[in-house]
From Swiss-Prot:
Belongs to the SHO1 family. Residues 34-44, 97-102 are extracellular. SUPFAM superfamilies: SH3-domain. This is High osmolarity signaling protein SHO1. Residues 1-12, 66-73, 124-282 are cytoplasmic.
């Protein structure tokens, strides 16, 4: 469960919107310089809008490269909202000027406002939203927020020691075998050592007891929460405790604590599932 799945650095939505915003910022910066040299009435506060948008672009680049959007989602959404207000105010102060320099600056501010609205909608919405899923479908089908959260889950899971699901049953089975071993030692003097009938019967009883205990230890009431798969997930072949599922599959989980949830599908298969691939529906 500690596999690394880094975010793709070629998300079309992220790259295209960042490219438009960068072009808009360059146009704005050049237009503001030209307007300031030609007109003494240039609104000074527009410079702060230019600087704030530049800082926002730098922050987005850092979060995108380090794949840490999930940690700073609310801060990023608020910062984009502030940048939208600053750019709108600067646009209002420049758009009514008929000269070319203020017109260029206001055009750059308008481009940045449009991109900021798209970012507000994308980062402020839940990744499971149908519209957001549609936007992500044009690229790697990987939402940058989900990918960041999934990487966090994988890092946490890699640093934790995991107890296999079969451990309780293994202890119980070993105890059963030890009791039978003691019994056989006491009665070995009176039985034929080459008679394998009793040994075979003990093994059959042991297997039946293990299967019965497993079924009785996992009643349906232990999985009260219904979830649905947001994306396809293939269990690691190196970890028998993971559970595979497809997008749209509905099954039940034991609880929603931590980054990995213990689930049980309709076939009765039990395993651990990454929480960021699931949506609680009941």
């Amino acid at each position: 469960m500690g596999r690394s799945n880094p975010v793709s650095l070629f998300n079309p939505f992220a790259l295209s919107t960042f490219g438009f915003s960068s072009i808009g910022w360059i146009i704005t910066f050049a237009g503001c310089i030209a307007t300031n040299t030609q007109n003494n009435g240039f609104p000074k506060f527009a410079w702060w809008a230019v600087v704030f948008q530049l800082l926002l672009l730098i922050v987005i680049v850092v979060l995108y490269i380090t794949n840490t959007f999930h940690y700073h989602r609310f801060f990023l959404t608020c910062a984009i909202g502030v940048a939208f207000v600053y750019n709108s105010n600067a646009t209002n102060n420049l758009v009514y000027d008929t000269s070319s320099a203020p017109a260029a600056a206001s055009a750059g501010f308008i481009i940045q406002c449009i991109v900021n609205i798209l970012w507000l909608f994308y980062f402020g919405s839940e990744p499971s939203s149908p519209i957001i899923s549609y936007i992500d479908s044009f690229g790697s089908s990987e939402n940058v927020m989900l990918s960041s959260k999934r990487s966090k889950s994988n890092r946490n899971a890699a640093g934790q020691s995991q107890i296999p699901l079969d451990e309780p049953y293994k202890d119980e089975t070993m105890g059963y075998a030890e009791r039978n071993s003691v019994s056989n030692d006491n009665s070995g003097l009176h039985e034929n050592p080459f008679n394998t009938q009793n040994y075979t019967a003990q093994l059959s009883g042991l297997e039946n007891a293990s299967t019965t205990n497993r079924a009785s230890a996992l009643p349906e009431d232990d999985y009260p929460i219904t979830v649905r798969g947001l994306f396809d997930y293939d269990a690691s072949p190196d970890d028998i405790n993971e559970l595979s599922f497809k997008k749209g599959d509905i099954f039940r989980v034991k609880d929603t604590v931590g980054n990995w949830w213990q689930g049980k599908n309709s076939k009765g298969e039990i395993g651990m599932c990454p929480s960021n691939y699931l949506e609680v529906i009941g």
